[in-house]
Amino acid sequence: MFRHAWSHRRCIVPADGWYEWMTTVQGKVPWYHHRINGGPCWLGGIWESWSSPEGDHVESFALLTVEANEDVREVHHRMPLLLEEHEVAAYLAGEDMRAQPLNLLVDRHVVSRTVNSSSEDGAHLTDAVPTLW
């Protein structure tokens, strides 16, 4: 299903960061990951155009994930395909960036579980919350 999209329908999703949930004895804890330098995260993805069973035209995309680098691994074993700005054109042209070293420095902090609520929206969802660790 995704082979054609991998070869011909790549996209970049610009983001300030992303969330991962760590399983702890207190339950799942959301962490916000972002570039240390504060720059944008260029996330590699694929897109598809298709028709639903009801006949609706749908445009969709999926983020690609790779094995987590050292900065992320403690929270989750996978992470989005994170590219440097100068790698974007090569990725869109079809280069396989999954084998590239993931040496981009990523910072993270715990955020409120409010991020899980679909009724919440806003920049405050990326604010750090106090923790004991």
For the regions a protein language model found, what residue spans apply to each?
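A structured binding-face within diverse protein domains that lines the active/interaction site
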Residues: 1-133
